[in-house]
UniProtKB/Swiss-Prot annotation:
Gene Ontology CC: extracellular space
Gene: Klkb1
A Pfam match: Trypsin
Glycosylated residues in this chain: 127, 215, 308, 396, 453, 494
Organism of this sequence: Rattus norvegicus
Protein name: Plasma kallikrein
Amino acid sequence: MILFKQVGYFVSLFATVSCGCLSQLYANTFFRGGDLAAIYTPDAQHCQKMCTFHPRCLLFSFLAVSPTKETDKRFGCFMKESITGTLPRIHRTGAISGHSLKQCGHQLSACHQDIYEGLDMRGSNFNISKTDSIEECQKLCTNNIHCQFFTYATKAFHRPEYRKSCLLKRSSSGTPTSIKPVDNLVSGFSLKSCALSEIGCPMDIFQHFAFADLNVSQVVTPDAFVCRTVCTFHPNCLFFTFYTNEWETESQRNVCFLKTSKSGRPSPPIIQENAVSGYSLFTCRKARPEPCHFKIYSGVAFEGEELNATFVQGADACQETCTKTIRCQFFTYSLLPQDCKAEGCKCSLRLSTDGSPTRITYEAQGSSGYSLRLCKVVESSDCTTKINARIVGGTNSSLGEWPWQVSLQVKLVSQNHMCGGSIIGRQWILTAAHCFDGIPYPDVWRIYGGILNLSEITNKTPFSSIKELIIHQKYKMSEGSYDIALIKLQTPLNYTEFQKPICLPSKADTNTIYTNCWVTGWGYTKERGETQNILQKATIPLVPNEECQKKYRDYVITKQMICAGYKEGGIDACKGDSGGPLVCKHSGRWQLVGITSWGEGCARKEQPGVYTKVAEYIDWILEKIQSSKERALETSPA
C-alpha cells in the first residue's frame, strides 16, 4: 500500500524548469524514481495541474488503472522531481505520465471545470443538501468558503434516501483522500479558482493588526503581498498574518502565518505593532493575483539550498538566470567586493522544500527575488514586456512603439493593405478570420513587420509569405464568434528593436480587469475615409459584455468576445484595422487581449467596437501550433 502524503501543494508557486514547454502526455508510461508525494486525482490532466502548482514537482505519473492486487493505487498521482528534468521511463499499462506546466505560462491556470461521472471523490463531508442538478451542486460548492470538491447522487442512485443529494467536501490537501468508481455518482471541483465564486472579495490589508485563528501552515516571505499570494493559492488558507522584519520575536520575523477558522471568517483582529493581516483572494472574480512575484528586493538576502552560483551583470540578469535554470525558485545577487569579478557579481540560485526562502536577512549588499517562470505567458521568452509607451480619433505612433504590429497586404494587379495582425512567435501571426473572406489564397498575401509608414514599402522591402493559413474551424462570420486565424510564416522572423512578439494572456486572464488598453492600425480614421500612411494608436476603455450587449440587440455578444470604446464615441477601430491588436498593460507586461473584429460603423456614439477575446482561444492557438510542429517533424527527412 502506498502512503499518500497530505501536502499543501499551493504553498509556493515559484519553482522552475528550463527544458521548455512540454505539454504532451505519454500513454502506458511510468516515470521511475524522483518521488516527491502522492495524491489522488480523477484524471491525468488534474494530476498535471497539481504537479504544476507543487513547488518542486517537474514530472508526474498517473495510474488510470491498477493491478487487481493494488486497487488502492488506481487514480494515484505520483509527483516527481529530477535534477536533469527527466527520469527513466518504464512501460506500465494504464499509466499516463507527463511534465509540469510550470514552463508553459500560457497554460497556467488552477481552474478545473471537468465533471466526473461514475466517480466518488472522497474527503471530509461537511455539508449535505438536496439539489436538482449537478450544476446547482457545483455552484453550492463554489459559493461555500470551505468547499473544495463535491459529489452528487443522481436520481438513479441505488439508495433512494441519497438521490439528488449534494455532498460538499474538503481535505487538508485540497484533493480527494480517495476515489472510487460508483454508479450514478458525479464528482467535481469548486470553481473558485475559475473566478466564478459569488462569495465576495475582501481586499483589505490591516496594518499593525494580527488574526489569532488556527494556523494551517507558515512560510517565509519578504512582505505581506507575497504572503497574500501564497495564501490565495494554498488549499485551506482563508486569511493570514505577516510579521515584518521589525517584529519583536526574531524567529517570527518575515513569517507568513496562513490561517483558517470554522466560520470562514477571522476573529476580531488584535492590535500588534509590526504585524500585517489580510485575506486570501481566492474568492475574487476580478482581482486574483498572478502566481508569481516580479519585485526585486534591494538590501535583502534570501537563504535556502544552493543550486548553483554564476557571475552576471545586475540583479535583473540574475533573476533571468534563475528563471531559465532548472529547479531555481529564488535568488540572491551579491555586491560584496569578494563576490564581484570583471564579468559580474555573484548570482546564487536557490530552492527550498516549500518554494519560499528558509530565512531572510537585511542590510545585505545585494538584492533578492523570485524566478519569473510562472509569470511567462507565451511560448517564447522573447515576448515584449517593455516598450517605449483602424484608429478613429487616434494619433501617430513612433517607430518601435508597437513592435508586434504587422500589415497584411494582398498582391494582385496592385498591392494594398487589407488587415492588421500581431506577432506571437518567430513563425506565427495572429489575426482575424474575416480578413480572408473571399481571399483564402496564401500565395497572394504579403506580411510586413517592423514598419511605421506604409509609404516606405517598395519592391525591395522584405516581406514574409504564408506557409500555412489556419482559420478557426467554427468560423462563419465575424459577428458570430470564432473570428480568429493563425498564420504560419514560410521562414522565421528575426527579432529586432522594431519587430518583436506580443505576450499572450493565460486562460486564467478571462476575468482580469484591464485599465491601460490600446488599439493600433493603419485603418480609416473616419467611417468613409481611407487607409492611413502612419500607424495610428488610441487608448480605449473596455466595456463590460453585459453593457455591450445592450448596444447590439440584434447580435449576441458571447464570452469569446470583448468590447471596447467610449460612450460618446469618437475613438475606435475601423476598416483596415481588422485583425490588428487590442493590447493592455497588466502587471508590467503588454498582453494581446483582443483582435479587432467588428462593430456598427466606426466610433459611433453608444456603439463600442467588438474584438475577439484571445484568452478564450489559448488552447486552440497552442493546439494548432503544436500540431503544425508535429506535422513538420513527420515530414522532415530522417
